[in-house]
Amino acid sequence: MSFLKKSLFLVLFLGLVSFSICEEEKRETEEEENEDEMNEESEEKRESPERPPGFTPFRVD
């Protein structure tokens, strides 16, 4: 009986550890994706500065 308790405890403990590691990796992946999205948005803003409607930088006569 004692052997079964120890085995069950070990299995549950290892399962909990592996679950927490998976959750941590998932959280890191989501943070990286959010950082990538923020970088893409900031690059788009830098590439296209805000201009009033109808404004063209070159004048054609």
Curated annotation (Swiss-Prot):
Main location, first listed in the record: secreted
Compartments, as annotated in UniProt: Secreted
GO molecular function: toxin activity
Pfam name, any one: FSAP_sig_propep
Range of residues in the leader sequence: 1-22
GO biological process entries: vasodilation
Residue ranges listed under propeptide: 23-50
Keywords carried by this UniProt record: Cleavage on pair of basic residues, G-protein coupled receptor impairing toxin, Secreted, Signal, Toxin, Vasoactive, Vasodilator
Tissue: Expressed by the skin glands.
Regions of compositional bias (Acidic residues) in chain numbering: 30-42
GO CC term (a single one): extracellular region
Superkingdom, taxonomy of origin: Eukaryota
Keyword RNA-binding: no
Disordered: annotated span: 24-61
Function noted in UniProt: Induces relaxation of rat smooth muscle from tail artery and contraction of that from ileum, urinary bladder and uterus. Binds to both bradykinin receptor B1 (BDKRB1) and B2 (BDKRB2).
Family listed: Belongs to the frog skin active peptide (FSAP) family. Bradykinin-related peptide subfamily.
Protein's UniProt name: [Thr6, Val10, Asp11]-phyllokinin
Origin species: Agalychnis spurrelli
